[in-house]
Amino acid sequence: LEFRRVLFRSQLSVTDSIEGALSGTEIAVIAVPSVTMRDNASLISSYLSENSAIVCATKGIEISSGKRMTEVIREEVRAVPPSRIGALSGPNLAPEIASGKVSTATVAFEDESVGVSVQELFSSEVFRVYRSEDVTGVELGGALKNIIAIGAGFIDGADLGNNAKAAYITRGLHEITRLGVAMGARPDTFAGLSGMGDLIATCISPLSRNYRLGVGLASGKDLELVLGELGQTAEGVPTTQAAVQIAKGLDIDMPITSATYQVLLEGMEPVQAIRELMVRSL
């Protein structure tokens, strides 16, 4: 396991009891795979109240509905007001945070007072938290960047060079922003930590599971084998499926996302997908 040697601080305790973890809590953090979010949110609903707040740290989109994670939580945890359900996102490679390296993030809540409380709670000398009220933008930046990270892995795995990768990341950000704005986000959010910041970190680091997935596919391995080797959730796979359907419904052109979908689910070779992106109509 990636964090088996990480020591918890003495103030922390571990439990497998939902009631024990959440009973009387003011701020709950939920960080589970997106495909299990609805079930997990339903499980915790009876332990929270109108005075609770929920911080969602999952970066994904529900495939079946196309809904963001906070939307799913709001549907399942009715006791907590929607304005008190928000998201934490940013360039947060978990192993670096666990080892105490300097990191930053953005927390987004519609209720400003809750956002301030969460910001103050999470901030430390090595973890600086900024605040936003654009929950949609913060969530979508964190979710959609995983799609782009898979393609960044294609480029590095095929040794296509830094020029290609820089151009790809730039166009990827443009694509994320285009879909995000169509879904109700503010465009400037994607220039921040939960957009550009998260995108850069995830596209350049071997600590990124989605990046490693792309590298593995570019080496000729099939999807199931690479996912098995990762041994962890790669949110870019279900998010790609969801994003393709959302973009189709909104009539938004998403060439990078579509190319990634073709590799993941239709068997296209990664290098061929990159080539086809290069010869699209100008």
PLM features: residue spans?
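Short, small-residue-biased leader/transition segments that mark boundaries at the very start
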Residues: 1-7
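Alpha-helix C-terminal capping/helix-to-coil transition sites in glycosyltransferase folds
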Residues: 2, 23-24, 50, 144, ...
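Structural alpha-helical scaffold elements that stabilize or flank donor/cofactor-binding regions
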Residues: 6, 20-21, 193
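Short, conserved active-site loop motifs that form the nucleotide-linked donor/cofactor pocket
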Residues: 11-13, 52, 127
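Rossmann-like NAD(P)(H) cofactor-binding subdomain of soluble oxidoreductases
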Residues: 15-23, 27-102, 118
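Internal alpha-helical scaffold of NAD(P)-dependent oxidoreductase catalytic cores
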Residues: 36, 47, 72, 76-84, ...
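NAD(P)-dependent Rossmann-like dehydrogenase/reductase catalytic/cofactor-binding core
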Residues: 152-156, 181-191, 195-282
